[in-house]
From Swiss-Prot:
Residues 29-148 form the VIT domain. Residues 595-618 are annotated as: Disordered. This is Inter-alpha-trypsin inhibitor heavy chain H4. Glycans are attached at residues 81, 207, 274, 517, 577, 719-720, 722. InterPro entries: ITI_HC_C, ITIH, VIT, VWF_A, vWFA_dom_sf. It comes from the Eukaryota. Residues 272-432 form the VWFA domain. Disulfide bonds join 747-925. The keyword Nucleotide-binding does not apply. Interacts (via C-terminus) with DNAJC1 (via SANT 2 domain); this interaction protects ITIH4 against cleavage by kallikrein in vitro. It comes from Homo sapiens. Residues 658-688 are annotated as: Proline-rich (PRR) potential bioactive peptide.
Amino acid sequence: MKPPRPVRTCSKVLVLLSLLAIHQTTTAEKNGIDIYSLTVDSRVSSRFAHTVVTSRVVNRANTVQEATFQMELPKKAFITNFSMIIDGMTYPGIIKEKAEAQAQYSAAVAKGKSAGLVKATGRNMEQFQVSVSVAPNAKITFELVYEELLKRRLGVYELLLKVRPQQLVKHLQMDIHIFEPQGISFLETESTFMTNQLVDALTTWQNKTKAHIRFKPTLSQQQKSPEQQETVLDGNLIIRYDVDRAISGGSIQIENGYFVHYFAPEGLTTMPKNVVFVIDKSGSMSGRKIQQTREALIKILDDLSPRDQFNLIVFSTEATQWRPSLVPASAENVNKARSFAAGIQALGGTNINDAMLMAVQLLDSSNQEERLPEGSVSLIILLTDGDPTVGETNPRSIQNNVREAVSGRYSLFCLGFGFDVSYAFLEKLALDNGGLARRIHEDSDSALQLQDFYQEVANPLLTAVTFEYPSNAVEEVTQNNFRLLFKGSEMVVAGKLQDRGPDVLTATVSGKLPTQNITFQTESSVAEQEAEFQSPKYIFHNFMERLWAYLTIQQLLEQTVSASDADQQALRNQALNLSLAYSFVTPLTSMVVTKPDDQEQSQVAEKPMEGESRNRNVHSGSTFFKYYLQGAKIPKPEASFSPRRGWNRQAGAAGSRMNFRPGVLSSRQLGLPGPPDVPDHAAYHPFRRLAILPASAPPATSNPDPAVSRVMNMKIEETTMTTQTPAPIQAPSAILPLPGQSVERLCVDPRHRQGPVNLLSDPEQGVEVTGQYEREKAGFSWIEVTFKNPLVWVHASPEHVVVTRNRRSSAYKWKETLFSVMPGLKMTMDKTGLLLLSDPDKVTIGLLFWDGRGEGLRLLLRDTDRFSSHVGGTLGQFYQEVLWGSPAASDDGRRTLRVQGNDHSATRERRLDYQEGPPGVEISCWSVEL
């Protein structure tokens, strides 16, 4: 937070809204500004979302306060209106041509003030901000409206809402209404802030075509605890859904003289691909980037279809092909390519031009030799993190060279790694050649971002798709021809109907399959469609015209990227005129925020461009770097030790950090090797403590270096303590409630199993659990849970949890709150890091990353009475008929279990129960090693 300016007597408080409001300071009691009402109303009609955010604040202080309204909205959205109501007067935002607003913007910059109200934040969001002075006891109402067309990606439409009030709000309500005439096929919600107290505040109602999601927490539900006046709301609320569809010409919807045509047919066979991966391995890709690229590339290669052909080109100063020509994606070739990808090292310059021309030549030669399968699709996928530095370095020349070489025969997709990449260069390179560009954000999930992008283009269904409508029925149609349709995506065409057109709108959609052309026919009654969109009371009306304008502007702006210089101005003029006519804040317009006469009139809202990100000081991760920029002391570089990784010097954003455990020290930490029979992970023990040697200790017989002497004494004392102290109680790898028992449990460790293990499977439950056990760590290195209905994969590792559905993967860090509800499955994770996978009809499976002794993943089961009689697996076998042997005469703490004809020894032991999360509770259980 910036300090108050000396010339003003008022203090400053931020009110940050992210769809809901976000108050970025402390509570109202301290600052005087109180958000007493926050509402968001989002109405989605046929994928077009109209969102209104309203915040009402009051200044309860005795002095003037400055309130800053700040909210986040999706990058693809256009702001359409902003207003403030102060003392009964409405002060609207006025949308103007950007050049017209430039004078006000420049005047503000000349005064050293921040005039831009919108800036990029994070990956897919932009931040809107405006400030105003608030008199004592005065009330202000802020209202912001924006609109967007939800894009189908990997079979899902997604609406993202950030929830971060940072103070308790008396009236906090969020309503999302969805109306889809095609029918809603599934609906799911996910949040990263939900607690057990908040579950009842989120309600979902759904019928065939409508859905209503409401979030309305009470004051007590918002509190972290009854004793704290701080809010627990801090995270994302995500709504995902899809609609019913069939093999048809799509769905035509009509309202108020405009129409929209959605096309995403089901049941088409995926076309074979010819894929050339062009991978940057220049020096700037070293470290985490190249590591994640290798990881993603290996998994992408595994996803290739046997019908596909592929090759790899890696480049730095020079470009190199993995194989002389395209090779089939056979198991043998994929395994060899995986080995090659695993050995890619980063070094040298960036020769993009030669690498791209080599990729085109590779496809050309295969085409000339008739080695491309009939009806196949040829793709080039480029991954780079920087500007060209070797060979041809002029971006325009490279774009021209590639465009001439491709000549419209192949599709090029460009992935820009990080914020230093020239995104504008890559975007034009891709759009010139029938593809698209995507920024890969440098983060812990970069490999997943790469894999998800590949999944978007991995399954082409149709090529050369064209939409045709009767000339006497429509006018002003948006783009109606497309190069490729991919599985999980959707083509959208919108237009205006003729005033006296026919009563029925017909459409013909044609495209190419691998071996034949295909034509779809569809029609829609104008009168019936008009009536359908007028009937729902809670869906906003006259949206279709705005959808058409929104889509037209987006496409015109995209066309300017690859248009010639002569055509660019005409395209911009068309987009500008529509932006002004429909009050959209786009890259060509600005919104001037008006204020009372006694306040400065210098704030202007402009739409950021994706290509401008490299010039903006934006940090999408934590606020660590921002903290140091504000003058805080930077800690000295320090080191930490992990039982799993050993010594590690952790680099922070502005320096390094060190984690010391007072009084804990091992010989390895002092720079000496541990004993040869002690594995690396045992060199450090969290329970060891160094005792002070008594003053009467006998003198040494020689005079070694004092530092060495201290080390020797410490090591001797540590060894002595280890032999005298009982081994600490450990957490088992898996905790299994015994069938028919309410208290007794099995604590199971599969110590004698090697490689991936089928832990349990139940075909009637539709669940399977596999994992890999590491004997040295006495825990699992990974666990994967597969559900058949819904089809979901949950892969847990010590780093994070990855959830995959509809070929789309999302990563979640341990101990981050998660609450996801979909038909047939609920996933929850709290701050302890306990992940629960449950459903009223399913066994509950719990996963936990245990970072205590025996670091690794842990597994637990609940509601095991729901297992069917067909359950099996290393752990599942204990839910078949289990026979207990009689206690040994001399020791009732030992029993024998007979399961499926095999005997297992069970010992009564004290273990740590982690079913409620760390640090665990000591329990007595029957311990079994498998």
